[in-house]
């Protein structure tokens, strides 16, 4: 039994699962990390990492950075554009295939065992242990960590369906000449009229643009909205070498269940993504750090709810207020752009969300308490037409 017994089995080697495996292995635990895919694998995602996201990692990721981002073009249907620069505080653009593989390599280097092409099939509890059946055989562990995405099979197996609400997102990879990439001047673009009750984005990478749309309000016409967004930009609309990809972004955990004793949900599997920007990697990594702290506190008490307690202390409030910020802004989308995005004070609050200067709760109350000021103010960030 000792040779096949792991302290922790992690299903899913995306950022949350792999980073938790890395942290848990550093604590001295015997960790098994499994993923159904063969690595490196393509992963549909905008690939923008905010500064606060990068700051959660305790190792360097320079080798997988496609482009450093210093700011953003902010526009409404490709009109009335303004620029917000944050310098080195903004973030980076990565390809998920390389970024995820880097974290897996770090986890393996810290002592975690990694099994790829190893799919979860079923699991059952036997006392304080969990027996997990995978396509690679039977595994026994003291803890089972579900980090297998928004459509988590582990979560469904133990908690049933309907736990996580999600919204569709779609993106396109558009290969453009270097001159167009250079014209972005290491900025991303957010178009707050590019998607009804949502936004469109353009992220420059090394050799292509990642272009997509997102809304917290689910829509069946999202592919049409992406094509409409691309049509707003003549330099993109005439391109023919476009690859389309769809995926889902979790919005919330409907049932508020993140743990059942020694079964824990991380990242997308737990419904962790903020609602305004649709950013999931930050909260995925944050949940991994919280889980590692909880494991350090309560490893010998498998029925302890330490993980849930720490989530409530450190993260769930921020997620709740991200939903309030999104509904406040996107319910009045055009007004939101012209009175909030273009207003220097309000813009600063939402920009600080990206770098970690404020949380969503503070941003919400600062914005709401100053509503009469920015609603009647004529102040605006300076206009700046992009060169693409």
What function would you assign to each model-found segment?
Residues 23-44:
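Glycine-rich FAD pyrophosphate-binding loop
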Residues 2-14:
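Beta1/beta-strand and adjacent pyrophosphate-binding region of the FAD-binding site
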Residues 50-102:
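A conserved beta-strand/loop capping segment in the N-terminal third of enzymes
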Residues 106-237:
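Predominantly flavin-linked oxidoreductase catalytic cores and closely associated redox partners
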Residues 120-122, 138, 217-295, 299:
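FAD/FMN-dependent oxidoreductases across multiple families
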Residues 17-18:
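N-terminal Rossmann-fold NAD(P) dinucleotide-binding loop
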Residues 8-10, 31, 263:
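Conserved hydrophobic helix-helix packing surfaces used for dimerization/oligomerization
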Residues 293-388:
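C-terminal helical "tail/cap" subdomain of flavin- and related membrane-associated enzymes
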């Amino acid at each position: 039994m000792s040779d096949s017994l792991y302290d922790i089995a992690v299903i899913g080697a995306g950022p949350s699962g792999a980073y938790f495996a890395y942290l848990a292995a550093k604590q001295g635990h015997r960790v098994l990390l499994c993923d159904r895919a063969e690595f490196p694998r393509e992963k549909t995602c905008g690939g923008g990492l905010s500064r606060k996201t990068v700051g959660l990692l305790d190792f360097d990721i320079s080798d997988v950075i496609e482009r450093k981002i210093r700011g953003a073009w902010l526009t409404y249907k490709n009109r009335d554009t303004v620029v917000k620069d944050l310098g080195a505080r903004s973030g980076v653009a990565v390809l998920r295939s390389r970024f995820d593989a880097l974290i897996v390599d770090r986890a393996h280097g810290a002592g975690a065992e990694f099994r790829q092409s190893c799919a979860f099939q079923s699991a059952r509890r036997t006392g304080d242990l969990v027996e997990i059946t995978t396509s690679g055989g039977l595994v026994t562990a003291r803890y089972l960590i579900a980090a297998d995405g928004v459509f988590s099979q582990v979560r469904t197996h133990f908690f049933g369906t309907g736990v996580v609400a999600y919204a569709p997102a779609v993106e396109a990879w558009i290969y453009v000449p270097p001159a167009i990439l250079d014209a972005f001047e290491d900025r991303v673009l957010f178009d707050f009229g590019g998607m009804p009750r949502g936004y469109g984005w353009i992220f420059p990478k090394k050799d292509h643009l990642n272009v997509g749309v997102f809304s917290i309000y689910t829509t069946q016409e999202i592919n049409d909205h992406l094509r409409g967004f691309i049509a707003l930009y003549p330099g993109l609309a005439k391109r023919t070498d476009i690859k389309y990809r769809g995926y889902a972004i979790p919005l919330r955990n409907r049932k508020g269940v993140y743990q059942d004793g020694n079964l824990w949900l991380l990242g997308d599997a737990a419904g962790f993504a903020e609602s305004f920007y649709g950013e999931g990697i930050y909260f995925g990594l944050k949940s991994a750090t919280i889980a590692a702290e909880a494991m350090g506190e309560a490893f010998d008490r498998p029925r302890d709810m330490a993980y849930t307690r720490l989530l409530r202390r450190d993260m769930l409030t921020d997620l709740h207020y991200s939903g309030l910020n999104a509904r406040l802004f996107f319910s009045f989308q055009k007004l939101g752009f012209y009175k909030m995005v273009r207003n220097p004070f309000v813009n600063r609050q939402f920009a600080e969300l990206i770098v970690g200067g404020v949380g969503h709760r503070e941003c919400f109350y600062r914005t709401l308490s100053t509503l009469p000021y920015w609603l009647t103010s004529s102040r605006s960030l300076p206009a700046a037409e992009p060169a693409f």
